[in-house]
Swiss-Prot record:
Belongs to the MinE family. Keywords: Cell cycle, Cell division. One of its GO terms (biological process) is cell division. This is Cell division topological specificity factor. Prevents the cell division inhibition by proteins MinC and MinD at internal division sites while permitting inhibition at polar sites. This ensures cell division at the proper site by restricting the formation of a division septum at the midpoint of the long axis of the cell. Gene3D superfamilies: Cell division topological specificity factor MinE. It comes from Acetivibrio thermocellus (strain ATCC 27405 / DSM 1237 / JCM 9322 / NBRC 103400 / NCIMB 10682 / NRRL B-4536 / VPI 7372).
Length: 94
């Protein structure tokens, strides 16, 4: 069962958007050998931490597990790629 973060964090998506998001998660799972549930948990944790410091557009947030060449170029390793639109930075007072 996929975690539906839109219910937890507010704004609801229409059926088309949900189906598209689920398909993306399945494809990511196939490429990186991680479950869609794991990726949703990572996404939720990233949102939680970043939200302490800035207001982000959760609807446009895109996090993917991909594969890339290692630094030595001899192997392929998983990589976490995040595109996180920032609406504003919170005043931390520090």
């Amino acid at each position: 069962m996929l975690l539906d973060l839109s219910k937890i964090f507010g704004k609801s998506k229409n059926s088309k958007d949900l189906a598209k998001e689920r398909l993306k998660l399945v494809l990511i799972h196939d490429r990186a050998n991680v479950s869609p549930q794991f990726l949703e948990m990572v996404k939720g944790e990233i949102i939680k931490v970043i939200s302490n410091y800035m207001d982000v557009d959760e609807e446009s947030l895109d996090i993917q597990m991909t594969r890339t060449k290692s630094e030595d170029g001899n192997s392929v390793v998983p990589a976490l790629v995040a595109n996180i639109p920032i609406r504003s930075v919170k005043n931390s007072g520090k």
